[in-house]
Design a protein with these regions (language model features):
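A conserved acidic beta->alpha catalytic loop
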Residues: 27, 44-54, 72, 95
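Short aromatic/hydrophobic "clamp" motif used to bind/position activated sugar donors
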Residues: 91
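C-terminal subregions of glycosyltransferases and related glycan-biosynthesis enzymes
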Residues: 185, 192, 199-335
């Protein structure tokens, strides 16, 4: 009997996070909706821990989980390698430290089925959109609307996905590997070639932190590199200068926690990204933006309240009274 093409491929690039991967896969196989319509791709970037043991264990136990190991570490090119292994109708990336929620897999499959005839580009943005919070489904007609809606979250690995045939025509997939943001260019190519997309913003996973966050230069990647990737699309007239200006403000707003911890209250216990030339990078992009000056002047005040007083004083006090979850839900509904 001929093998049926999977409906959905979930592609997990991983490196030296064996226990995180084990936790992730154990969760996936327990979910309602985990069946032959779902293919799991594990792309091991030549890990030196026991990632191979974990991957092979689950792939032997479940035929629809496929484990691949790179002969050498190929850095961020592993993201495209993971997608290249996928055979599903719709293929998407998932971080190795992202646990799909109990109803999440059913949700993903239902959305794919809804769109499988028209093949409109779709992205699962996991309740990350802060520019249009009240809309759980956002239809974007071009790159400008896509950037306006998603902004900094375009860089999120788990937000990227594509119909298999659309992925097949993405050019130069590893062009921006050194920038650590290949996925941004992939999304820009797809949205511009197919005249828009649909963003599904319902939360479908929750992340967990397997260790200290560290690695690249935070603002060099998320500011310098992001806008370097955007530039060719600006030059072609696919992204308006007005969109760039608005997006830069959205980026700055999104990175308020990082600004506070880099310049005012270092949290080196769990956040150890390279911060070399952070102010220089921000200055080069924002010296003409009044919001930048307001943000830097007021950061000690809103930062102390949001990231010190609330978690260390307000939250414990409300927990004692049994009111924290109620308060959090009320605030979330009003947003």
């Amino acid at each position: 009997m001929e093998n049926k093409q999977p409906l959905l491929s979930i592609c997990i690039p991983t490196y030296n996070r064996a226990e995180a991967l084990r936790k992730n896969l154990a969760n996936i196989v327990s979910l309602e909706g985990f069946d032959d319509d779902v293919e799991i791709i594990i792309s091991d970037n030549c890990s030196t821990d026991n990632t191979q043991e974990v991957g092979e264990y689950f792939s032997l136990k479940h035929p629809n989980i496929k484990y691949f190991r790179n002969a050498k570490n190929i850095n961020d090119s592993n993201f495209s390698t993971a997608l290249d292994h996928a055979t599903g109708e719709y293929i998407k990336l998932l971080n190795d430290n992202a646990l799909i929620l109990p109803e999440g897999l059913i949700y993903l499959k239902e959305i794919v089925i809804t769109n499988r005839t028209k093949r409109t580009p779709i992205f699962f943005t996991d309740n990350q959109i802060f520019t249009k919070k009240k809309e759980s489904i956002i239809v974007c007609s071009d790159l400008n609307e896509y950037i306006e809606a998603l902004s900094a979250f375009i860089t999120a690995i788990s937000c990227f996905g594509a119909w298999n045939e659309q992925w097949a025509i993405v050019n130069e997939r590893t062009k921006y590997s050194e920038y650590k943001l290949n996925q941004v260019d992939w999304a820009f190519q797809i949205v511009s070639k197919f005249n828009g997309c649909i963003l599904y913003d319902q939360q479908y996973y929750r992340g967990f932190q397997p260790g200290i966050r560290k690695g690249y230069n935070w603002f060099d990647v998320h500011i310098n590199n992001f806008y370097k990737i955007m530039q060719p699309y600006i030059d072609k007239g696919l992204i308006d200068k007005k969109t760039v200006k608005i997006d830069k403000i959205n980026h700055l707003y999104h990175f308020k926690p990082e600004i506070f911890q880099i310049f005012f209250y270092p949290w080196r216990a769990y956040w150890q990204y390279d911060t070399t030339d952070s102010f220089k990078i921000l200055w080069s992009h924002y010296k003409t933006y009044p919001y930048f000056y307001w943000l830097m002047i007021t950061a000690p005040f809103w930062g102390t309240w949001s990231y010190i007083i609330v978690p260390k004083v307000v939250k414990p006090f409300l927990n004692i009274l049994g009111l924290y979850e109620i308060t959090r839900k009320i605030i979330k509904r009003k947003q």
